[in-house]
């Protein structure tokens, strides 16, 4: 299947899943979950759904467990919204930790910047 078509399917699935998670799932454990990306296999049999969840590690784990249990409902809603598709991919929900990594790296850079302000590096002439 053409890459353009796969990307269209992935983008539509991301929008649909994001809306369903935010507006239709009633499980309070889900909290602030955001669909950050969807990758669809070339044969449209599988879709990796990346989800970013805010909260403590325990809250994130509980939210991902709740989303895993809701996979059937999510897939059904995708099928309803994308009724033009003959087959709806199996959803593989993956916790997206890239935001955590970005925040961690930001903290590291801020610490380095602070250290340079407190203890500026010595120039060769000053040694």
UniProtKB/Swiss-Prot annotation:
Pfam families: RBFA. It is found in: Cytoplasm. Keywords: Cytoplasm, Ribosome biogenesis. One of its GO terms (molecular function) is ribosomal small subunit binding. It comes from the Bacteria. Monomer. Binds 30S ribosomal subunits, but not 50S ribosomal subunits or 70S ribosomes. One of several proteins that assist in the late maturation steps of the functional core of the 30S ribosomal subunit. Associates with free 30S ribosomal subunits (but not with 30S subunits that are part of 70S ribosomes or polysomes). Required for efficient processing of 16S rRNA. May interact with the 5'-terminal helix region of 16S rRNA. SUPFAM superfamilies: Ribosome-binding factor A, RbfA (SSF89919). GO terms for biological process: maturation of SSU-rRNA; ribosome biogenesis. This is Ribosome-binding factor A. InterPro entries: KH_dom-like_a/b (IPR015946), RbfA (IPR000238), RbfA_dom_sf (IPR023799). Gene3D superfamilies: 3.30.300.20. Belongs to the RbfA family. One of its GO terms (cellular component) is cytosol. Its main location: cytoplasm.
